[in-house]
Amino acid sequence: MKLGGPLRVIAAMVALHASWPLAAQAHQSISLALGWGVDTARSPERDIVRLWQAYLADRPDSNHPSPHWSASEQAEFPDFDLLRGYVYQGFPAWTVVQLTPAPGADSTYVLRTLVAGTYDSGKAVKPLALFRVYAVRENGRWVLGNAFLRLTRDWPRETLGSVTFVYPPSYHFDRSRARASARFVDSLAAAFGLPAPSGVRYYVTHDVEEMFRVMGLDYFPSGHDTAGGRSSAVDRLVFSGFSKLGEGYRHELAHLVFWPMTRVGHTHWLVSEGLATWTGGAAGLDFDGLLPGLARYVRAHPDVSLESIASDPPPREGTLDVGYDGFAVLCEMVFKKGGVQAVKSLVAAGSSVDEVLGTAARLLGLGRGDLDAAWRRRVLGILTP
């Protein structure tokens, strides 16, 4: 999920057009075991495992400077551990399943780890992730580094405007679509009076499986979804796992544009996702294309409300994400009533549901009790009687 989103493994499974999930809020000790065939009798293998153990013992679920991670990566990426929100979710059983030299790279080792939970007194093991980091030499010592930088090292890339697109050698790069995405970043930033993000890296992949693999996740639960995207606004990174959109995954680019508004931590995660959905679409559809599915859902669920959606978002089904789409409509309503400044007020309303909905009602000139009725009218208004 996006930074600021709910910490639930299932949420990360069903919302693949989201951004990063949050890392665990409280660090739990990690038990690191060595799998069959992982030999640490000699160096550098012994030193690398000790390095990994030291990093895992130093609150890896929270973002803080680490002597165990590449200094150059920490300088480039403010939230330097790309997989922080995915793998550090309180699962206690960690096993190093591979520690081998990386093919085609000097002084570089692949460190692949399985994260799992145990159940029924240890009789059942349920994996959360199989992921990789790399151990590299930097300033005469071993440090850890992200997989995506090594796995895409030889990929073609092209810079258009403020966005550098990186794509597999087998991929047919759509320069026209990429140029339109770069223009979208600039125009959206200008419309909201925000500085356009610079130095954006946009990684194009064919599908979600390849996207996760490039990020370093050889396995991560993705449900039935085969397309989606991820972004890290603070690191100016976008990963597109949807070949239909390729260079045009605007939802994730919108998150980067709105980062100056949402980074202070006073924005409800669904307001952030709704804003990106309203301006950048989601699941391969633009905002208008998402509305019919939402309208059919609202008509079939007469008791649904903004509060119920925010408190317990329904699982995504196909292209329908009631939380994202429903709050996109709310953002649109607020914009039509009060323009950009009203949207900024909604974004700054706070992280609680009561703060968000109370502010939305005020911005729309409604009583709190009338907000849902107005929202339903807007959603259902697109359906033919």
Predicted segment positions?
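Short beta-strand edge/turn micro-motifs at domain boundaries
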Residues: K123-W155
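Surface-exposed, charged secondary-structure patches
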Residues: F80-A124, F239-F242, R250-L253
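Short solvent-exposed beta->alpha transition segments
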Residues: A33-W36, A57-A102, M211
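Short, low-complexity N-terminal intrinsically disordered segments enriched in polar/charged residues
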Residues: A24-A57
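Bacterial N-terminal signal peptides that target proteins for export
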Residues: M1-I10
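Acidic/His/Gly-enriched intrinsically disordered linker/tail segments
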Residues: D225-A227, K244, R263-P385
